[in-house]
Amino acid sequence: VLTFAPFFPEYHPYVDLTGAVLKVVPADTKSFQINFEAFEEMLGPRVAAVLVNTPNNPSGAVYSAETLTKLAQVLTRKAEQYGHDIFLISDEPYREIVFDGKQQPYVSKFYANTISCYSFSKALSLPGERIGYLAVNPACPYAAEIVNMCGQISRGIGHNCPTSLMQLAVSKVLDLTSDFSVYEKNRNLLYECLTDCGFEVVKPEGTFYIFPKAPEADAAAFCQKALQYDLVLVPADSFGCPGYFRMASCIDTE
């Protein structure tokens, strides 16, 4: 399984538990779009799936329609070359949280063998609630088989099943979201402050994270120093981008 840096660190145990191996494509730190040169080099005949996360945790990058079109073209070409399917797993918990009037393109529109994974916890500000859904592109020839298989897995993993009460509650607010304008205001404030202070940072297009480059080589040491100013920062070694750190802005602006 291939994924793109920076990535959510828990992908490692998710993939490891299946008996597969997660390999990380190095980041394009200029934009945090896909590094296609490195991706094509790593997309060998043993790759069964590619895991994407857009809008991205931790960078806040939103993959453009151009990026997703090129990704689909590469996957289609390589699947034909190797003579087997390559699945695209799209992790989409931040799908609605995009800024500047933009929208996150639906990844499944670009590639038939797409499995979309969604969580209500971000759009509804329900941190920690494990409630969402998995959707398979109807154009995927294995859609019915995958849905049935995932249903069996869901019943078997009891610790990750949402309560009936929460399922009923969420069903009543499917057309609602939190007020994302607060996140966008915080994004703008943080970005302006960081750039004014000389930090190197790509302006996030979504999520409630911002991902600056640390002012020293050891990002973990920098984050440790920041604690004395009541700043809880996350060094990005585990995200696949050493030398960077993640800040979250999902709090009151004040």
Spans of model-derived segments:
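PLP-dependent class I/II
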Residues: L2-E254
